[in-house]
Amino acid sequence: MTTQLEQAWELAKQRFAAVGIDVEEALRQLDRLPVSMHCWQGDDVAGFENPEGSLTGGIQSTGNYPGKARNATELRADLEQALRLIPGPKRLNLHAIYLESDTPVARDQIKPEHFKNWVEWAKANRLGLDFNPTCFSHPLSADGFTLSHPDAKIRQFWIDHCKASRRVSAYFGEQLGTPSVMNIWIPDGMKDITVDRLAPRQRLLEALDEVISEKFDPAHHIDAVESKLFGIGAESYTVGSNEFYMGYATSRQTALCLDAGHFHPTEVISDKISAAMLYVPRLLLHVSRPVRWDSDHVVLLDDETQAIASEIVRHNLFDRVHIGLDFFDASINRVAAWVIGTRNMKKALLRALLEPTDQLRQLEASGDYTARLAMLEEQKSLPWQAVWEMYCQRHDTPAGSQWLDSVRTYEKEILSKRS
C-alpha cells in the first residue's frame, strides 16, 4: 500500500466516522452484493447457435468495433480479462443461445449438458450463473410472437424452450451452490393499432403458468419475468406490459424484473423498487442506460444508477434484490464496456453504503427538509473515492483508470488479431 493511499484512506475513515459511518463495515457489505455481468456485451448478442444470423426482437446493437468474440473460448477469455479489472463479487448472466454443441440443437431441446463448459468455468472463476431463455433471433419468432403466439404449435415450441431453460437454470444453481435467476423476456407485440389486446395476454398468462409448472428448489432456481414498453417493430402494443407482469409476479409470487430502459423516458426504475417490493418476493434489476429509447448504452455513475443503488441499501434489500446489467455497445472496446459499466454499478453501491441514512431518515421524519437536502448534497463531496481505491487495492484490481492500460494491451495482443 502506498503512503499516499494510506493517508487518503485514513482521512476518509475520519471524515465518514464524523457522520456516523464505519467504512470497514461498508466494504464488508459491498462484498455481499454481487453484480451479474451479461455475457452478450462480448459478441453483440450473437450467441453460438447462429452467430451470423440477424439480431431480432426489436433490439439493436450498433457499432462495429473490431475484436468481438466469435466463439465460447474467446468470449470466456474476454470475460476473464474484464473480471480481473473489477473488484468484489461477480456473477455471469447467460442467454440460451450461448450453448455449446458439436451438432445443432433446437431451442426446445437444450439441456444442462450444453452448458457444462460454462459451469466448469464458473467454478474455476468462483462465479454464480444466471440464465435467460432466448425468445428472439429465431425463425419461429419472426412474426413478432412467441409465448403469446396464436398458433398453438409455435406457442408450444416456446413454452418448451422456457421449460428446458428452467432445467438448465436449476442445474446451474445445484452445481454452483447459489441460485440462478432465470429471467423471461419476450418481444411479443404489434407495430400498429391493435384491436384485440386481451387474447394475446390471455395466451401469455396460460403459457407462463405451464412454463413454471415444474417445481424447483428455490435454493437452485428463481423465476423472473420482465416487461417492456415497446420495441422496434412493436411500437403500438406490447403483450408483456408492466401491468401484466406486475400482476403476474404478484399473483404467482415470482421475481419481477425491472429494466432501466423498458419504461417511458420520464420513468425511472429507482422509484418502482419500493412499490414492487410490497407485493413480490424478489426483484431482478437490469441496470442499463437508455438514451431516448431502450438503447442499452453502457452504465454510467449517473443520478439514476446512484438512485437504484441507494434504494437497495436504504431499505436493506440485499437478500431480495438481484443486480444485473444489460447493455451492449459495439462502438467501443467490448471488454472496456464491461469494466466501465460494472465498476460504475459497484461505485454506486459503495456510495450508497457510505450514506448516513439513519440521520437522513430522522431529518425527513421530523420535517427538516432543509437539513435533509443539505446533508444529501454535502455527502457527495465526502472522499468516497479513497474508500473505493482501498477496496480495489484489497481485491488486487486497479483503482483508477490504470485498468485501461491492461485493456489496451489485451486489445493489441489478442483482440486485434481477430478477423
Curated annotation (Swiss-Prot):
SUPFAM superfamilies: Xylose isomerase-like
Cofactor notes: Binds 1 Mn(2+) ion per subunit.
GO molecular function: L-rhamnose isomerase activity; manganese ion binding
EC number: 5.3.1.14
Cofactor(s) needed: Mn(2+)
Keyword Ion transport annotated: no
Cross-referenced InterPro entries: L-rhamnose_isomerase, Rhamnose_isomerase, Xyl_isomerase-like_sf
Gene3D superfamilies, alphabetized: Divalent-metal-dependent TIM barrel enzymes
Catalytic activity: L-rhamnopyranose = L-rhamnulose
Residues that, per the record, bind Mn(2+): H262, D294, D296
Pathway named in the protein's UniProt entry: Carbohydrate degradation; L-rhamnose degradation; glycerone phosphate from L-rhamnose: step 1/3
UniProt KW keywords: Cytoplasm, Isomerase, Manganese, Metal-binding, Rhamnose metabolism
Enzyme class: isomerase
Any one annotated GO CC term: cytoplasm
GO aspect biological process, one term: L-lyxose metabolic process
Keyword Isomerase: yes
Localization (cell): Cytoplasm
Subunit relationships: Homotetramer.
Function description: Catalyzes the interconversion of L-rhamnose and L-rhamnulose.
Family stated for the protein in its record: Belongs to the rhamnose isomerase family.
Protein name: L-rhamnose isomerase
